[in-house]
Every structure is written in C-alpha cells, then in structure tokens.
Amino acid sequence: MPRTTAWEARANRAERIVREVRAALPEPVREAAAAVAVRLDRRVPRHWLADGVEPDSLGLFSGPSMRDADASQSDEAPLVSLFLENIFDWCGGDEDAFDEEVERTFLHELGHFLGLEEDDMAPRDLD
C-alpha cells in the first residue's frame, strides 16, 4: 500500500476543512459559495508570481465577484486558491494552527467573492 506524503496529508486535511466550512455556512452564503471552485497548491504558481502576487501569499481569489455587474458574462469562473505550504510555513509547522489558518484563509478569499474588501475583513477577524 502506498504511503501518503506530507503534502498529500496536508491537502486531504485542507479539503476536509473546506468541505466542513462550506457545510457550516448560512444557507444563502452556502448557495452562493457553491459557484466557487477551490484549488489547492503547494505555493503560488509562477504565472501569478509574474503578475505580482507575493510569493508568501496564503491564498488568492480570482475571477468575478458577486459585486461584478457582468459576472455572468465572464469566461473566468470564481476560484479560491489556497497555498498550503505557505500556510504550513506561516503556522510554524503546527498542525492545529494549520487547520485554523486554512479555514481563515478560505473564508477570507470567499469574502472577496462575496464582494468584501480588505477593510471589511478585520471586523470579521479575517484579515
């Protein structure tokens, strides 16, 4: 039987956390969030680094938000990307802190899909 790598274990944990967080969202938010895909990367992909995304970013929302008037006309789907090795490093290798930060980062990026700006995140403890 093949062994699970540390990366696979982290990705499995993150998938479970995102699934649980989505299920716990209030109904209207949960319905809206169903349109958002989630991508788990080790680190920030090169093409985003070339676009100016910081290499130590924990997550990123891309695509149209709910505030975009022409969101239904966009060819790009809403996407939350989580950079799991960056999150793990940020948490100093602490597994419990990793779980909490995956949840927090997912909610932060989902907030951008819902139309929240960075200043809107702090009162929700998502900054």
Which residues does each predicted region cover?
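Active-site rim/adjacent substrate-binding subdomains
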Residues: M1-E101, F113, E117-A122
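Short hydrophobic/aromatic patches at helix-to-coil boundaries
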Residues: R124-D127
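Short alpha-helical catalytic segment bearing the HExxH-like zincin motif
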Residues: E101-E109
